UniProtKB/Swiss-Prot annotation:
Free-text function comment from the UniProt entry: Catalyzes cyclization of the linear tetrapyrrole, hydroxymethylbilane, to the macrocyclic uroporphyrinogen III.
E.C. no: 4.2.1.75
Gene designation: hemD
Domain of life of the native organism: Bacteria
Pathway: Porphyrin-containing compound metabolism; protoporphyrin-IX biosynthesis; coproporphyrinogen-III from 5-aminolevulinate: step 3/4
Protein name: Uroporphyrinogen-III synthase
UniProt GO MF annotations: uroporphyrinogen-III synthase activity
Pfam families, A to Z: HEM4
Disulfide bond annotation, renumbered to this chain: none
Subunit structure: Monomer.
Signal peptide segment: none
Length: 246
């Protein structure tokens, strides 16, 4: 089995390195890269507006990294008053490392639905909520917090940018390297991969590969696109992906 990892850098490269250490044949094929978000200049003032028991959310490690870089440039600190939340363990660790604050996150699965089930997010009417995220993505968290009575604002900390490839050339390369397992960690990247690979290679190679995804929502999308052999990892971090690939 040869494994194609589409997760962006640096996590994608780390996963490939760990797979190779375990004797697996693995390749990195990142589909997106990241650049600073347009709303970063407003971040420090948005953070300063948060009071005691208000809510601060980080939806990815990338949001934390770009936010920290911006605050460092402005010689500003993370606030101590709000309650901190993260989408999952890895993002929580990154946020704790830069802020020093206690971070609440879902212990089960790193998805919006599970985050929103936390007891601390049930009675939030009248609280301010600031969500650190990238461009695009799902609106479920913001919409749900608003429905529960919170005053929600966003800071686009980074932008996802598609990396451009010659689809036929890449399909030939990965088919020649006998790739039979593909790792995809977002719906956006799954759609991008499907669109990138020309129809002939899609039907004769890509859709015959086993697909490893990180949620049932992604698995459903994959089935709609034509995949049949789909495995869902028990979480979205590299440890979970590694377990699923053993």
């Amino acid at each position: 089995m040869s494994i194609l990892v589409t997760r962006p850098s640096p996590a994608g490269e780390e996963l490939v390195s760990r797979l190779r250490t375990l004797g697996q044949v693995a390749w990195h094929f990142p589909l997106i890269e990241f650049s600073p978000g347009q709303q970063l200049p407003q971040l420090a003032d948005q953070l300063a507006a948060l009071g005691e028991s208000d809510l601060l959310f980080a939806l990815s490690q990338h949001a934390v990294a770009f936010a920290q870089s911006q605050l460092h440039q402005q010689d500003r600190k993370w606030p101590r008053l709000p309650d901190y939340f993260a989408i999952g363990r890895t993002t929580a660790l990154a946020l704790h490392t830069v802020s020093g604050q206690k971070i609440l996150y879902p212990q089960d699965r790193e998805i919006s639905e599970v985050l929103l089930q936390l007891p601390e997010l049930q009675n939030i009417a009248g609280k301010r909520a600031l969500i650190l995220r990238g461009n695009g993505g799902r609106e479920l968290i913001g919409d749900t917090l608003t429905a529960r009575g919170a005053e929600v604002t966003f800071c686009e900390c980074y932008q996802r940018c598609a990396i451009h490839y010659d689809g036929a050339e890449e399909a030939m390369r990965w088919q020649a390297r006998e790739v039979t397992m593909v790792v995809v960690t977002s719906g956006e990247m799954l759609q991008q991969l499907w669109s990138l690979i020309p129809q002939w290679y899609r039907e004769h190679w890509l859709l015959h590969c086993r697909l490893l995804v990180v949620s049932e929502r992604l698995a459903k999308l994959a089935r709609e696109l034509g995949w049949q052999d789909i495995k869902v990892a028990d979480n979205a971090d590299n440890d979970a992906l590694l377990r699923a690939l053993q």
